[in-house]
Amino acid sequence: MSRRPQPGVLAVIAMAGALGASAVAGATTVPDPGECAGTIRFGAAVSETGRYEREGKDTREGYQLWENWVNDEYGGIKVGEECFNAEVVYYDDESDADRVANLTERLITEDEVDFLLGPYASDLTMGASAIAEQHGVIMVEGNGASEAIFERGFKNIFGVLTPGGDYTRSALEALSAAGAETVVIAYEDAAFPTSVAEGAERWAEEFGMEVLATESYPEGVTDVSAIMTNFRDLDPDVFIGGGHFNDALLFIRGAEELGFQPGAMIITVGPSNPEFVAELGDSANGVIGPTQWEREMTWEDEYFGTAEEYAARYEEAYGREPTYQAAESTATALTLQIAIEQSGSIETDAVRQALLDMDVVTFYGPINFDETGKNAAKPMGFIQIQDGEIRLVGPAEVADAELQYPLGE
């Protein structure tokens, strides 16, 4: 049964929006949920099982943290002078592109959600956002970094994260300055890793580095030894691996078994997750990982406070440190909330325009969308695992440790 606002509620929203009323964070009195004018429903198909289940868990927890905060502490979403409860409807997409498309259709047509929060992974976001576009429903996402998502002329997809093509930019610039000259790239043949690899080739050339080889591999592989053997024989300064968490483990274990020891290893997704260090132990030391967010970063907002304060809140709720996937998921929902509040409406056209006009800084970083829906304002950071600790080494203005290069020296 749908809980979306009824016609009378929509009239209240429209009238309040016309009056230009707005709300700010920090209300001294949090209304009882029953005192709000209605409920705004958000739909989220996330990976609770399958190959993306680790990242999917982080995604769901990020959404849940926002949902609990906005209802229990913030006092509901402020639309004009009224408050509205937030409800997120979840389904397990099983890390499957066909299933996420079907579930997105279900969320729109059966559950009658008002807005959509994106799934984890670019390939799933591609399909889900296509269904959203067909129905004219806004989707804000924080876990699909492939530029291809935003190159289809869609009006209703907005991504808060730094695009995949820029994942390695900061790290390659720093490594080039440290003397690295040659690069090899391995990537999974899927939307996000392809975007990372194409960007890495572009930025390596920009920084005067030679790409010795680029090789792709199919989704779901369990052995990358052939690629790593070829790369070992090329003796590059830098190895770049584009994939997801399990791929990151394969790269490190494969390199170790084959005696492949480049001066630096940049690997997406895995290294910034404490579970990566826990699984690999000392083998993780020295690995560099692009990161969308870390608790040491200096961004803050009036909602969750500083990045550190957000991290502490997450730890209290879930008993572990937040990954950047969790943080960007919370930021996704927060961004949609801000757009609703700034527009004074839940009507699609008004909220879409508020997203296009948005220029804010959150605990996760700056949010400013270009005409395609990409966040054009947010830089990418990078970490390095040093003595078993995840240390922020770039960009330099927010780093808490110095880059170690080359490894073994």
Which residues make up each language-model segment?
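Extracytoplasmic "Venus flytrap"
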Residues: 30-39, 43-66, 91-97, 120-123, ...
